[in-house]
Amino acid sequence: MSDMNNPSDENTGALDDLWADALNEQKATTTKSAADAVFQQLGGGDVSGAMQDIDLIMDIPVKLTVELGRTRMTIKELLRLTQGSVVALDGLAGEPLDILINGYLIAQGEVVVVADKYGVRITDIITPSERMRRLSR
């Protein structure tokens, strides 16, 4: 009966051969680096494919909101509001209006009248760095 913890010399040689075969197989199958597997090579890919991807999102609806201003009030003040009440806002008259898409500030503009309806003329597009600065307030 052989001891499992102390293999014989012929078993040791066979075991070494198995380990060597396994290591050689592993080296042969892992010639690519992990970065090659994760990242694809950038290049002059198919531009029409990218345009098709953009076309997929073109019909997604977004909510555009134009804010005159904001204010804070207590529930008591809110409940006291009646028809004809005036609520003072923090925006000043003539100050640019905030234009938001889905709640995120993207531009500023001014009120215009278009065919007897209100409209907004965009006067300034907010840069990504400006958006980040405003979000951190």
Swiss-Prot record:
Gene3D superfamilies: SpoA-like
Protein name: Flagellar motor switch protein FliN
GO biological process: bacterial-type flagellum-dependent cell motility; chemotaxis
GO CC entries: bacterial-type flagellum basal body; plasma membrane
Record-annotated disulphide pairs: none
SUPFAM superfamilies cross-referenced by the UniProt entry: Surface presentation of antigens (SPOA)
Protein species of origin: Salmonella typhimurium (strain LT2 / SGSC1412 / ATCC 700720)
Family that this chain belongs to: Belongs to the FliN/MopA/SpaO family.
